Amino acid sequence: MTAWRRRLLPVALVCAAVAAVWWSVVEGRAEQRTNTRLNLGAAPLVGRDEVDGWVWRFGWSLVGAGLLALLVVGACRLGWWWRVRQRWVLLATSLGAMLFATLLALSDGADGLRFGAEDKTEYLANLAKAPPAGEFVRTFVDEIDRYSVHVRGHPPGFVLLLKFLDAIGLSGVWPVVALSILGTGVTAAAVLLTVRAVAGDQWMRRAAPLLIVAPYGIWMMTSADAVFVAVGALGVAAVAEGISRRREQAVWWGVAAGVLFGSLLFLTYLGATLLLVPALLLVAGLRRRDVGTSAVIAGGVAAGLAVIGAFWLAGFWWLDGVQATHEQYYLGSAQFRRWGYFAVGNIAAALVALGPVTVVGLGVLRSRRMWLLVGGALAALLASHLSHYTKGEVERIWLIFYPWIAIAGAAVIARSWRWSGAAAVGVQATCAIVLQAALLSKW
């Protein structure tokens, strides 16, 4: 690619992104006026008010989020991310991501944290009606009609997790909120560990500040999907770490990855598409003849099949769940949502969640190793999109892919020009804070 084409590509991507978002907002408002069953309220995003979800408001926690963003900007300007040890980069990113997302949610007070966990459509509301764990798994497909919309749209795994928490005395809404907070931090750390294993220390340091202020953090803190994202991220990290290890160690990394990805399949059906990311890493490892690749595959496949087999023995076959959820999906709002709009609207919602720095990064990223992660996630997202299984609500549904795409923004950050990192963080944080102030999200 010639130099002028390289300069033109990010500009073209930004223009296309702006056009997609603008069209989706304008067309979405028209769609909402003529289709009262669209149930979005802030198309292409979802608002808590299904008529008009755009509610400008101010919370003092947004000032806190702004101050945290300024701290990250200052750290970029002073070169802090490049000087400190890796453990401090991981810790700062993990804690920063949790704090930034929490401060955004707190702009609506405690309700901003609780609503996504205790709403009647969410998982927690189903504990009272769900039978004991064994019976719940065994009858899940046959009795799927009795549960709320989010349980009907997912495998039974997260309800089982809530049942376990309830059994050990961690009942109620706040343990669920804590899971989302923890999932946000774990995701950031796992993604950085993967980037380090795949592309090296410098790319990890470049990506770190962007994971703190990513706009998709708005939805990480207020939905169970934060747990799904964390489990998937840990699985990818286990694969990445195992590939370069000796066979004796690699097989155990593979087992860990298999357990994590096997579990992910029973938390969200999209876990199957996320497998494209570790699959690309494994193919690259085989081509490079990395010593641990075959052991990771063997351990991962064995452990993953063991998890699937355990659920099958308990009475739940994954493919039956997929079919039941597909039927439920088209009995709900999906039947009233026009694909002609969501073909673009879904992409627009994803662009909003990822932020403009990610879009620019996709245009300038040249590292082949980074593209293993970014490209795998983009392919997984595209597969989900073209399945027509997601029409709207993708700012939450596609959270499982967003961190792996967001790291493309690291390509705009240069160690030699510290203002690049400061500017990138400032832009992403501003987008997140303004969006939180304008949108009263359902999650």
Segments from the language model and where they lie:
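Start-transfer (signal-anchor) and selected internal transmembrane alpha helices
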Residues: 1-18, 50-118, 298-300
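Membrane-interface alpha helices of multi-pass inner-membrane proteins
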Residues: 212-219, 235, 251-269, 273-280, ...
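Membrane-lumen/periplasm interface segments of specific transmembrane helices
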Residues: 17-34, 263-266, 281-363
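Hydrophobic, aromatic-rich transmembrane alpha-helices
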Residues: 70-74, 349-374, 378-385
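Specific aromatic-rich, kink-prone transmembrane helix
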Residues: 190, 228-246, 257, 405-408
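Membrane-interface helix-loop-helix junctions at transmembrane boundaries of multi-pass membrane enzymes
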Residues: 246-247, 289-297, 362-378, 390
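Transmembrane-helix motifs of polytopic, lipid-linked glycan transferases
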Residues: 71-77, 175-198, 206
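Short acidic/glycine- and proline-prone juxtamembrane loop motifs at membrane-interface regions
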Residues: 216-228
